[in-house]
């Protein structure tokens, strides 16, 4: 069993905001496998797929971003999952250009409140993640950065750019589950495989 959690905020008003990139990634993976993420479990919506013969639980916490750790830690306990080996978290990263992704084996949550909540709830930052770039593009970068930007619906052009990152995120998830985090880092953190240049 493997647990893949996408972070975001529930509610239609947040659906296509940069902060919901993790939810969008889980939805894209589920759609690709004709799965639905709708079962309520541990304060999250969940669904199941198979990757490389391994059962994968897809999850979207319903706790809102800042309390993501409540749902993630409950799922980890219920599924008897090891956060280092059996967990992968997908979330937005304001400091990466939109359309790019970074696969990390562990690390600081930096300023991401959802990642901070997970670190606090699990008692460790040693859990794999895919950070999905949502950094604003264009001349209004400085004006658009921050909380208001993260919670504002994306422009069509930015959504189109993000689609490429969601597709690469789905491939990265499959690689982590079937071949390991090290292989995924080598493959998806190379600039030529990672969307727009930083």
From Swiss-Prot:
Which is a GO BP term held by this UniProt record? rescue of stalled ribosome
Residues annotated as binding tRNA: 14, 64, 66, 113
User: Site described as Stabilizes the basic form of H active site to accept a proton, positions?
Assistant: 92
EC number(s)? Answer: 3.1.1.29
What does the UniProt entry say about where the protein is found?
Answer: Cytoplasm
Q: Where is the active site?
A: 19
Q: Which NCBIfam families match?
A: pth (TIGR00447)
Name it. Peptidyl-tRNA hydrolase
Q: Which organism is it from?
A: Acidobacterium capsulatum (strain ATCC 51196 / DSM 11244 / BCRC 80197 / JCM 7670 / NBRC 15755 / NCIMB 13165 / 161)
């Amino acid at each position: 069993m493997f647990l893949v959690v996408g972070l975001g905020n529930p509610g239609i008003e947040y659906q296509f905001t940069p902060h919901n990139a993790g939810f969008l990634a889980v939805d894209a993976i589920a759609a690709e496998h004709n799965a639905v993420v709708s079962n309520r479990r541990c304060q999250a919506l969940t669904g199941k797929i198979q990757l490389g013969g391994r059962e994968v639980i897809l999850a979207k916490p319903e706790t809102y971003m800042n309390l993501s750790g409540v749902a993630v830690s409950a799922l980890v306990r219920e599924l008897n999952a090891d956060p280092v080996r059996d967990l992968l978290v997908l979330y937005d990263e304001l400091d990466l250009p939109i359309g790019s992704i970074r696969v990390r084996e562990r690390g600081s949550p930096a300023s991401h409140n959802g990642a901070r909540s997970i670190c606090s709830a699990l008692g460790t930052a040693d859990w794999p993640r895919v950070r999905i770039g949502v950094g604003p593009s264009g001349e209004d970068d400085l004006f658009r950065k921050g909380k208001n930007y993260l919670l504002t619906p994306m422009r069509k052009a930015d959504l189109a750019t993000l689609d490429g990152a969601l597709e690469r995120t789905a491939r990265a998830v499959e690689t982590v589950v079937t071949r390991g985090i090290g292989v995924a880092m080598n493959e998806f953190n190379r600039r030529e495989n990672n969307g727009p240049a930083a």
